[in-house]
Amino acid sequence: MIYWLFLAMAIITEVIGTLSMKHASVSGGVVGMAVMYIMIATSYILLAMAVKKVALGVAYALWEGVGILFITVFSVMWFDESLSLMKVGGLALLITGIMLIKSGTRKAAVKKSAEVVKQMANKAVSVATTKSSKIKEA
């Protein structure tokens, strides 16, 4: 659970960093650039912590995809950037792609878990058979 929180914080810091970059480029402020560097560095650190337990493909897709979604929304609200029908379609496809990646990872994780359980069961049967043979010999 904590790794998902790391991922959420990585997304938030990435969005703050990217929006700070835009703000600094519009206002010419040095503070915005400093905030950008700190937030983006923090974002990568948190992402690295998240991928210890969250699948890399899922983590990166969420980090980048959700980040783009929020950056687009805030850019329209705060920087008066346009939001065309084409951009809305792209964002919808992005969300769909993230959902597909996430659902595909769950199935792969379940399959991998099933394989591990099967291997453990086979090993247990092997050990039990060996011990049973030794008891019969005695």
Curated annotation (Swiss-Prot):
Gene: mdtJ
Domain of life: Bacteria
Oligomer and partners: Forms a complex with MdtI.
Gene Ontology cellular-component annotations: plasma membrane
HAMAP family given in the database record: MdtJ (MF_01598)
GO MF entries: amino-acid betaine transmembrane transporter activity; antiporter activity; choline transmembrane transporter activity; spermidine transmembrane transporter activity
Membrane topology: Multi-pass membrane protein
Function: Catalyzes the excretion of spermidine.
Family of the protein in this entry: Belongs to the drug/metabolite transporter (DMT) superfamily. Small multidrug resistance (SMR) (TC 2.A.7.1) family. MdtJ subfamily.
Protein name per Swiss-Prot or TrEMBL: Spermidine export protein MdtJ
GO biological process: glycine betaine transport
Keyword Transport attributed: yes
PANTHER family reported for this sequence: SMR FAMILY PROTON-DEPENDENT DRUG EFFLUX TRANSPORTER SUGE (PTHR30561), SPERMIDINE EXPORT PROTEIN MDTJ (PTHR30561:SF2)
Segments traversing the membrane: 1-21, 30-50, 54-74, 81-101
Keywords noted in UniProt: Cell inner membrane, Cell membrane, Membrane, Transmembrane, Transmembrane helix, Transport
Primary location class: membrane
Subcellular location: Cell inner membrane
